[in-house]
Amino acid sequence: DSFDFIVGNPPYVPIEGLSEEEKARYKAEFETASGRFDLYILFLERALDLLAPDGRLTFVTPEKWEYVKAAAPLRKLLGARGIQVEEINHIEEDAFTGLVTFPSVTTIQGEGQGKTKVVLRDGTVHTTTLPDNGQSWAAKIRGADLSEMETGVTLGEVTTRVSAGMATGADSVFVEKRSEVPPSLKPDWVHPTVSGRQLGKNGSPRSDSVLICPYRANGTLVEEQELGAFGEWAQSHRARLEDRSCVKKAGKKWYAWHETPPMQDLLQPKIVFKDIEKEPRFWAERKGDVIPRHSVYYLVPDQGVSFDELLEYLNSPIAQEWMEANCQRAANGFLRLQSRVLRQLP
């Protein structure tokens, strides 16, 4: 059976809310169940299957399906089937009481070609032609003309790494004020560190915090029998450290961090920035000794790439305009500066 009209507000259930059995079943049944898919994406696919060729579908969903990687198969499916996205209306971010979901009302026509009408939250209206190959729609929907930025080279191609900082799984243990670190641990077992909050407050990657670190400069974990002063200190926190998922589920050593640090990249001169920011800003960490925490991202320029020119470009109005057009929205007008997106910056 097919339907002339389909209207829905499907459940927003991230992949973490699904059981392993559900994930396996959905991946076998739906083209769009790939990566970190959300349940509403599958509802959209099934609705498209049920839509008559000349029918019309209107769904309320989070706007992020328009640009996140997990929804690329759905965007590609629309293009492959020749389905016309007639209108996208970004309604108030807090339209659902108590939730900030950045909802979007999307109206789809079963068959057709042409431009898409876009209504943004600030009331501006424009029409655009959406990519039909699964690429992000963000820049098109937000009305940004960034064609002059195309250089044939992206940020990902001139950097060794663009990545989030380290997650220890127990910052309350591994992060200390420098003045409060036991003397026996200094300097061999500590590295300067910075959080997103400190970066914004200080305006610099320098802070009074350090990470107590059981890793060598090459990124290998020091063996337990060689821990010395670190081992004596860590024993007093052993119960807390053993209670982490990386130990209980992933089988990591009880004193290891949640993530294994790529020390050879971390301990390089780098550019750092907050993971969520209203107006993106980038700072130089020239000494190459700061290990950013998980709320701070960092990028390491390739050899031969001018550190200062890259830093200046990232803080330039044109680069900021690109981020405004392409980055995922967060609450209160903030942007998420995700490495996957930033690597595509021209």
Where are these regions (language model features)?
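Signature of N6-adenine DNA methyltransferases within the class I
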Residues: 1-174, 293-295
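Polybasic, glycine- and aromatic-enriched phosphate-binding surface used to engage nucleic acids
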Residues: 134-346
